[in-house]
């Protein structure tokens, strides 16, 4: 457990590694502010909808995340599981470029980030870039659909098949292409 830190998130990632080691094919770890009544990534600085602030990010959440995620990746690598395990850490949107009156940041769907590791992907690859304030993508915007297509393709599912609607229109099963930049 020391490798993952002492946080709830670290304990959940350790359990995830144990599940993967036992053959589980997909594990999801979610952190919401209702989880164990503690601060999480919902950073509005408002006790009614997301109590965390940027100071909580700096002092607690980011160090816990860094320790736990790096512990998971190191542990998977030491056990020979990292090449066969795809780890994705992301939220469903970004955060406003400007701090609100409560020292938090609100929802911002136009610009977001994520981490994809393991799975025989090229390490250190960066796909896309934002402007200096993380307001807008300025190079190679990535959509959540592309991340979904990447996960599905990595799992060996063909993302090209078409589905037929009631009116006989053929639509792609997943209308996005995988992030091929992640494979060297």
Can you annotate each of these PLM segments?
Residues 1-184:
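Ligand-binding pockets and gating/stacking loops
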């Amino acid at each position: 457990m020391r490798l993952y830190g002492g946080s709830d998130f670290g304990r959940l990632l350790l359990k995830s590694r144990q599940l993967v080691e036992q053959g589980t094919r997909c594990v999801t770890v979610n952190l919401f502010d209702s989880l164990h009544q503690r601060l999480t990534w919902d950073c509005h600085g408002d006790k009614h909808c997301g109590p965390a602030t940027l100071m909580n990010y700096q002092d607690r959440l980011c160090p816990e995340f860094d320790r736990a995620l790096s512990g998971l990746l190191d542990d998977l690598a030491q056990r020979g599981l990292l090449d066969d395990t795809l780890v994705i850490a992301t939220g469903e949107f970004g955060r406003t470029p400007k701090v609100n009156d409560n020292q938090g940041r609100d929802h911002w769907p136009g610009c977001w980030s994520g981490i994809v590791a393991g799975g025989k992907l090229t390490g250190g690859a960066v796909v896309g870039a934002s402007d200096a304030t993380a307001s807008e993508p300025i190079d190679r915007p990535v959509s959540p659909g592309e991340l979904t297509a990447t996960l599905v393709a990595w799992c060996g599912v063909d993302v090209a098949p078409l589905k037929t609607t009631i009116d006989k229109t053929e639509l792609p099963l997943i209308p996005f292409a995988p992030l091929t930049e992640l494979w060297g």
